[in-house]
Design a protein with these regions (language model features):
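Conserved ATP-driven motor cores of ASCE-family P-loop NTPases powering translocation/secretion/packaging/pilus
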Residues: 496-534, 725, 729-827
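Post-Walker A helix-loop "phosphate-sensing" segment adjacent to the P-loop in P-loop NTPases
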Residues: 461-471, 486
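Conserved lysine of the Walker
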Residues: 452
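Extended, folded cores of ATP/NTP-driven motor/assembly subunits in large transport
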Residues: 2-400
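Hydrophobic anchor at the beta1->P-loop junction of P-loop NTPases
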Residues: 444
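P-loop NTPase motor domains
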Residues: 76-89, 261, 356-357, 367-423, ...
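The conserved Walker
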Residues: 448
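Hydrophobic positions on the alpha1 helix immediately C-terminal to the Walker A/P-loop
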Residues: 455
Length: 903
């Protein structure tokens, strides 16, 4: 019997020990989570949290207003002003509890039905890539009077409702995205904090175990780091809302507490920022009392304390600042088998560099964790967990940044954000939810080797996949692969097969001011050249001839009308009287002579017939008609011989007789992807601008005919038309594109191209609301000129000089970055693409030859060749494209690999 009693006693003790080890010692800690909330209620769509100590809270989900890596110092100060205003709005008896939550996730994209091959490859390439997402919640809590009995105070309740809506409106008016959590969302938010799980779709609860160092739940452990040790508040005397990091010898502002969003090994981080708003009158009295106490015992340390208090009192009196109590802590969650010391070292070192020494005595882990529940902040110990400061200083320690998210837009162009995950932006700046631009024309500048053609391949590929008609003018075979992939039309200029069109062939409805203007520019370009100067008389003369040419074709010339004869008669009489030649004739004889001149002019015009519309017929008409017009209007100084000589090159029998006389392939208007390759004539001072102008007119016609989105991309060929002669036409085209859902883009690599040309500035840049800049390091010494021409701000320049310079390469393939400004909104994005896209865009000859070998050997489509080639490339284990292409070319066959290449 005694043995049974002993065994029972041992079992009882063992059970008690296990219970204490697992669930704590009982008492208050045992029921600590049950004692937080009384209920969650719905009040007009707002979920209100009621605690058992009598406080009630509303939770707003917000998005921090400062874009990460925005480089804008003012935006950090705007944040401090905003939250100081929120504190002023709430006033005594309220607390602001801001929780910034950082969650380590893996990128996942749901494949769309019938997704294009390259887009599917793009998202498959990024699937599983780790990144940090962020969430932000702001809890507004009204303090309850501490007593054993709680009574309902309708006045306080109404005050609470009024103030939470004021806060919501103040945030919204400042451009912050904000919404109240409803009852279900508020309950879920609390559950997720309890489980420290903001990643999974469903949340499961588990037992919590706490010790002096950590709080554990299930398969994760958490440690709470208090930012300030109240017994030894180690903070700098002066604090700003941002700090600077050095990137490429340029200072880049980042959040003062940006270290909390990249803690190593952390799966979840919750940064708790709590501001309590006490009675100002009481706190000032206590401060004054403290000052007097220090002053009563004169010694150096007390004297310093008195001076510090006086300084604070002066600031409060002069600037109406608030005294607030604050608490800051970080709840860092890691997998259960992870050592937290690495997190601790990172935080101590990072904050130490800023002069902030985080508390080393956080033995009350469970209490800190529980007090950080939404709405439960008033359970923080007033003596040990709160410190007094000014509201501005407190707000400086808040987290202010947000990560880049995809924009709401029907046209999605994917880049990577600066941590390497895809985000969609509205490249036009005018089709998304937020309108950023008035037109979608763009200007792209990047030195040779900066990746601008690769970037443009990516942009036009995505535009075309989303229903955009693309026309490109290229001078270096940069888009041959993409054109072949899409099965588009690739037109190369050769002497045997020149790019031709008959710009004079139009119908009566097309005859308008802009068509006349285009033809006038075309004729003047041939006559004068790109750098030639045109007088107003010459300009008017060519316009006059073109008008009469079409009048002769559409209407014919049967003779002058009575009014035309009268006008011509008056003109000839005036000219005759002003003539220096003296004639001895009567008025009647003069009238007869002038009538004879009119009959002669009329006869010559009747003889001028236009049977068909072409350059040939225009040439024939103009060389006969121009002398008559000059004679009729007493025009002098027109060099008709030069006109005939220059125009004749494009006339029947001339070197370029086909260029302006043969009709262009009409199927081009139905093609959705067209590339004009004109590298062979880029050094021809006449053909180069002329053919470029022809292509632009083709795009204009396509722009009017097609109802979908259109884009024209002109690579280096734009230089051919950047002349005073073409300036007005370029302006016209840019402005017209906006009216027909079209964009015109210019891509260049030479800095001198934009510095030395007023035409570029006036006609192109001023009409391009979208600016794209690749790595500008080569131009850094001369960048002030570019800055002035492009209208870049100092903030823009700071961003530009971080291109390809951030420490964000780890775990990523080779990529380039590009600065994009849409209107006044700008950012830096990554151009990172999978092997399939790379092989579609590549201009490297060896790589193109290797891909052609696969296509030829497999006798398959371009897409199938890319699939097979990239499969072997991935299996080979060779990281870079060129070495693998060389292996393929050496083998001279399809590799069909099953294992990694070892040598």
């Amino acid at each position: 019997m005694t043995l049974y009693i002993i065994l029972f006693f041992i079992a009882l003790c063992t059970g008690m020990a296990l219970s204490v080890y697992t669930f704590g010692t009982g008492g208050k800690r045992k029921h600590i989570f049950q004692n937080i909330y009384f209920s969650v209620e719905d009040t007009d769509g707002v979920g209100v949290l009621y605690t058992k100590t009598g406080e009630y809270s509303a939770v707003l989900k917000i998005e921090n207003p400062v874009q990460k890596y925005s480089a804008d110092i003012d935006s950090y100060y705007d944040f401090t002003h905003l939250f100081s205003a929120l504190a002023q709005t709430l006033g005594e008896g309220y607390a602001l509890h801001k929780q910034d939550i950082f969650v380590r996730k893996q990128f996942a994209n749901e494949p769309e039905h019938n997704q294009e091959f390259l887009s599917a490859s793009y998202f498959r390439y990024f699937n599983g890539r780790p990144y940090t997402d962020s969430l932000c919640y702001l809890t507004i809590t009204q303090e309850a009077k501490k007593s054993r009995l709680f009574s309902y105070d309708s006045k306080k309740w109404r005050d609470f409702l009024v103030k939470i809506y004021k806060v919501r409106d103040l945030l919204r008016d400042s451009g912050v995205q904000v919404k109240f959590l409803n009852k279900a969302e508020a309950s879920e938010y609390v559950d997720r904090y309890f489980a420290m799980n903001f990643k999974d779709r469903t949340v499961s609860m588990t037992n919590v175990k706490a010790d002096d160092e950590t709080v554990s739940m299930g398969d994760k452990r958490c440690k709470v780091y208090s930012l300030v040790d109240v017994d030894c508040a180690a903070l700098p005397s002066l604090i700003r809302p941002y700090t600077n990091i050095e990137v490429n010898n340029t200072e880049m502002p980042v959040d003062l507490v940006s270290v909390v969003d990249n803690i190593p090994n952390a799966e979840t981080v919750v940064y708790n920022q709590i501001i309590f708003l006490p009675s100002q009158k009481r706190e000032l009295a206590l401060l004054d009392k403290k000052k007097n106490r220090h002053a009563s015992i004169p010694n150096p340390s007390n004297q310093m304390a008195v001076e510090d208090i006086k300084q604070v009192q002066d600031v409060i009196a002069r600037e109406s600042k608030l005294l607030v109590y604050t608490h800051f802590n970080m709840v860092v969650g890691v997998p259960a088998d992870t050592d937290l010391q690495k997190c601790t070292n990172h935080l101590e070192n990072a904050f130490g560099r800023m002069g902030i020494h985080i508390s080393k005595r956080a033995y009350n882990q469970l209490e800190l964790f529980v007090s950080s529940f939404p709405g439960n902040c008033y359970s923080l110990n007033e003596e040990y967990d709160r410190f007094l400061t000014l509201s501005d200083a407190a707000v400086c320690l808040m987290y202010k940044e947000r990560v880049q998210h995809s924009e709401e837009t029907p046209i999605k162009i994917y880049y990577t954000d600066r941590q390497g995950v895809p985000v969609a932006i509205d490249i036009t700046g005018k089709e998304g939810k937020n309108k950023l631009t008035d037109n979608s024309n763009f200007f792209c500048l990047g030195p040779s080797g900066s990746g601008k053609s690769f970037h443009m391949n990516s942009v036009v590929r995505q535009l075309h996949e989303q229903g955009t008609d693309v026309v490109m003018v290229d001078t270096g075979n940069s888009y041959e692969g993409l054109c072949e992939y899409f099965g588009g039309k690739y037109i190369s200029y050769t002497e045997e097969r020149p790019i031709t069109m008959n710009p004079f062939r139009i119908n009566r409805e097309e005859m308008n001011v802009e068509k006349t203007g285009f033809l006038k520019n075309l004729v003047l370009l041939i006559w004068k050249g790109t750098q030639g100067t045109v007088t107003k008389t010459e300009d008017r003369l060519i316009e006059h001839v073109i008008t009469e040419y079409y009048d002769a074709y559409f209407n014919g010339f049967e003779g002058f009308t009575p009014q035309q004869r009268e006008d011509l008669r008056k003109s000839l009489v005036i000219d005759d009287r002003n003539s220096s030649e003296k004639r001895h004739e009567s008025e009647r004889e003069r009238a007869v002579r002038i009538e004879g001149i009119i009959d002669e002019i009329e006869g010559r015009r009747k003889e001028l017939k236009v049977e068909e519309l072409s350059f040939n017929s225009f040439y024939e008409y103009s060389v006969q008609r121009i002398p008559d017009i000059c004679e009729e209007n007493r025009i002098t100084g027109i060099d008709l011989s030069t006109y005939r000589y220059m125009m004749k090159d494009f006339y029947l029998g001339g070197n370029h007789e086909k260029t302006l006389n043969e009709n262009m392939d009409s199927s081009l208007f139905d093609e959705t992807f067209v590339v004009f390759e004109i590298d062979s004539i880029k050094d021809d001072p006449l053909l180069f601008p002329l053919v470029t102008l022809i292509i632009m007119d083709v795009f204009l016609q396509k722009m009017r005919i097609k109802k979908n989105r259109k884009v024209l991309v002109i690579e280096e060929a734009w230089k051919a038309i950047a002349s005073p002669l073409m300036a007005e036409y370029i302006k016209f085209m840019y402005k017209t594109a906006r009216k027909f859902w079209a964009s015109v883009g210019v891509v260049t690599q030479e800095i001198q191209d934009i510095i030395g040309s007023e035409i570029v500035k006036e006609a192109i840049i001023n009409n391009s609301d979208v600016v794209m800049l690749l790595d500008q390091s080569k131009f850094k010494e001369r960048f002030d000129t570019i800055k002035a021409i492009l209208g870049l701000t100092d903030v823009d320049c700071k961003k530009i000089f971080t291109i390809n310079r951030l420490e964000n390469k780890e775990g990523r393939s080779f990529f380039r970055e590009v600065f994009i400004r849409r209107g006044t909104t700008s950012g830096v994005y990554g151009v990172e693409e999978p092997h399939e896209c790379y092989m579609t865009y590549t201009t490297e000859r060896a790589e193109k030859e290797a891909l052609k070998l696969y296509k030829r050997e497999l006798q398959c489509s371009h897409q199938k060749a890319i699939e097979a080639y990239c499969r072997d490339w991935d299996i080979s284990g060779i990281g870079k494209a060129l070495p693998f292409a060389q292996k393929v070319n050496e083998a001279g066959r399809v590799l069909n690999l099953t294992t990694k290449i070892t040598s």
